[in-house]
Amino acid sequence: VGFKAGVKDYKLTYYTPDYETKDTDILAAFRVTPQPGVPPEEAGAAVAAESSTGTWTTVWTDGLTSLDRYKGRCYHIEPVPGEESQFIAYVAYPLDLFEEGSVTNMFTSIVGNVFGFKALRALRLEDLRIPTAYVKTFQGPPHGIQVERDKLNKYGRPLLGCTIKPKLGLSAKNYGRAVYECLRGGLDFTKDDENVNSQPFMRWRDRFLFCAEAIYKSQAETGEIKGHYLNATAGTCEDMMKRAVFARELGVPIVMHDYLTGGFTANTTLAHYCRDNGLLLHIHRAMHAVIDRQKNHGMHFRVLAKALRMSGGDHIHAGTVVGKLEGEREITLGFVDLLRDDFIEKDRSRGIYFTQDWVSLPGVLPVASGGIHVWHMPALTEIFGDDSVLQFGGGTLGHPWGNAPGAVANRVALEACVQARNEGRDLAREGNDIIREACKWSPELAAACEVWKEIKFEFEAMDTL
């Protein structure tokens, strides 16, 4: 026999602490929790092997290729402070292992079978460094932040949205009516809920028609460009494309997709169509918590966010920060920057393990939504800045006077915060006062403030930065 048969020690081949990473390598940071008795080098090497060229035993066909050229390498291991049995393994993958322009293929390798590997108790992908050479094979977001602002003719402030509730059960006409009321009141966007697809009580085509009517009517009334995220997510790619095509025929500005449940292949297909046809693409992250919520296993949302920027989307939901823990604020702002900026420096305090250069791939607007209302507006304006979409579902529709006054309240609060910021006032310290002053000339805002006043507004902690 021309080769040595038998089960292999991974670390002989796949643990290479002297390796100098290449600019073209995809780099991954894994949080590894090995089974008791498995040394870190062996576990790290096993991760590199199982997510690249390795198999559990030496095979005859290894001799027909150059392992050195194609293998993943565990090139560095560092302990996790405060965790005895955990460490971070850094793995470098040669670029040739991945199909160009395919997030699907990248994930199949890097977060594929290796996550079920027996020698590990748990495995979490914390971050990826996408090399510029690979970034350039992706189209990325259909339009990006600047083009979106130009299309909408809205500058110098965050955009306002609202998810239409109750999310399931309204007829198409009543749904369109709710959309119209919100847009007329001063919102920029309304949104299909992520689970509104095409159910018996409201088929997609009827909803699209009535929402388009609401958009045109509110545009004529307000003189502003309006949009409604029409959810094109469907059971098959063909149905999804049918919905996107119909949206384009109606002349609406934006459609929506659930990128994790719909899948990366479908998402990239839709993103390409959106760029070719001038549609903005709003992305919802339903199912993300199944993947990213466990600290020890799965993958961090910043990886899903990077993958979305490659696959394509103009907006993506990114949490709210408000009312969360201080540490989470920094981590959230870390991946918000990864979505928006062109070049992001490595910064472990914000959870960013690698410097990422997006080489002019368009940026994605982060969407803050979930449990926010007018009292949060100063905090949101301060934290997210202008390039964001602030979405108030219940915070609009829960207004005691109805949808349009709810929209007015949010718009007045936003404009007051932006104006105060531009005048140099400190939103962190004066947030409550700014909202209270604005109440004097907006009865709608005063009513909203009254409804949600007992909900605490904790925002002092910013001063510690």
UniProtKB/Swiss-Prot annotation:
- UniProt cofactor note: Binds 1 Mg(2+) ion per subunit.
* Keyword check for Signal: no
Give the source's domain of life in one word. Eukaryota
| Keyword annotations of the record | Calvin cycle, Carbon dioxide fixation, Chloroplast, Disulfide bond, Lyase, Magnesium, Metal-binding, Methylation, Monooxygenase, Oxidoreductase, Photorespiration, Photosynthesis, Plastid
Kindly provide the PTM information from the record. The disulfide bond which can form in the large chain dimeric partners within the hexadecamer appears to be associated with oxidative stress and protein turnover.
N6,N6,N6-trimethyllysine: residues carrying this PTM: K4
GO CC annotations, alphabetized: chloroplast
Question: Which residues does the record list as N6-carboxylysine (modified residue)?
Answer: K191
Q: Name one Pfam family in it.
A: RuBisCO_large
Q: Which cofactor does it need?
A: Mg(2+)
Report whether Ribosomal protein shows up as a keyword of the record: no
List the active-site residues.
K165, H284
EC nos: 4.1.1.39
Q: Name one GO molecular function term.
A: ribulose-bisphosphate carboxylase activity
Q: What does this protein do?
A: RuBisCO catalyzes two reactions: the carboxylation of D-ribulose 1,5-bisphosphate, the primary event in carbon dioxide fixation, as well as the oxidative fragmentation of the pentose substrate in the photorespiration process. Both reactions occur simultaneously and in competition at the same active site.
One further remark on this entry is: The basic functional RuBisCO is composed of a large chain homodimer in a 'head-to-tail' conformation. In form I RuBisCO this homodimer is arranged in a barrel-like tetramer with the small subunits forming a tetrameric 'cap' on each end of the 'barrel'.
Q: Which NCBIfam families match?
A: PRK04208.1
Name of this chain's protein: Ribulose bisphosphate carboxylase large chain
